[in-house]
Amino acid sequence: MLVQPWMSCQALAEVRKLVGTYKDEEVSITVTGHSLGAALATLSAFDIAENGYNCTASATFPVTAFAFASPRVGGASFKQRLDTAAAAGLRVLRVLNSGDIVPRYPALPYHDVGVELVIDTSASPYLKAPGDENVWHNLECYLHGVAGAPTASGEGFEHVVERDVALVNKSYDALKEEHGVPAAWWVPWNRGMVKGDDGRWSLLDCEDEDDREDALVSPVNK
């Protein structure tokens, strides 16, 4: 149930191959994604379980989808079929940020599916307040929220999983200034532009991946 039928067939064939290879071991299948990717993860996990790609002659292996910031993907009939697929080992965990509007759409007749885990990144002392729709939907902010938990008093936020807060600013300006992390720092060196011998700048075109990585390293780091 991917964007193109052949993509779905290719993915399912690979799952069947791996299940067959490791059928005598303890196996679990995990599918994950963010935003539209989370919707695809939900559909893919459902496809695997409903069509028995997680089964062998002697076992049914669990299939789990971790869907971050997923829009709704089906109506009442799909929800019913997905709930029924739980008997075939399917579990779906939808992680949503309280300020993110994407998981609320499309509206009815679309339905929420699976189990819902709500986080609230606005409670984080690391992030600028109040934030905006880009920050609330950003995957790194989601992972920051999942890595934390309310304090014992329930009035604050603390990290319970060691995760670098600098990652929050990979593509946005979400961290408070006091942390000294530049906004949107995750970019290729000079965005892939290189200066030629003639003094002109052009987009790097390397066929060899090692050459590409070497050219994109900052001269300061070489």
Stretch-by-stretch model annotation:
Residues 1-32, 42, 46-222:
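Serine hydrolase/lipase
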Residues 37-38:
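Catalytic nucleophile loop
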